[in-house]
């Protein structure tokens, strides 16, 4: 996995409790890899002391604050591209490698944005 990859993974058990969603699989973008340092300051997210690209940050505090944390070996930190409405690692934490089904390689919706990722 690489930063920016869009992945499909088995929904963590906390999703139903925290987000009220019972879908079996989720699709999110990888923003931090094992060994990366992640933190939130105000309403911005930093990975290895670098502010994430604007489209990956949120405009108001969502989820839980992230103290400076190193992503554990074998885990990934993911965010949804529709960040203001996404239940993602900000709410339920890291995604273990064992839960990842694969990488998304094509977008087919909306039709105006169809193409390879």
Predicted regions: what they are:
Residues 1-117:
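Soluble "head" domains of membrane/secretory-pathway proteins
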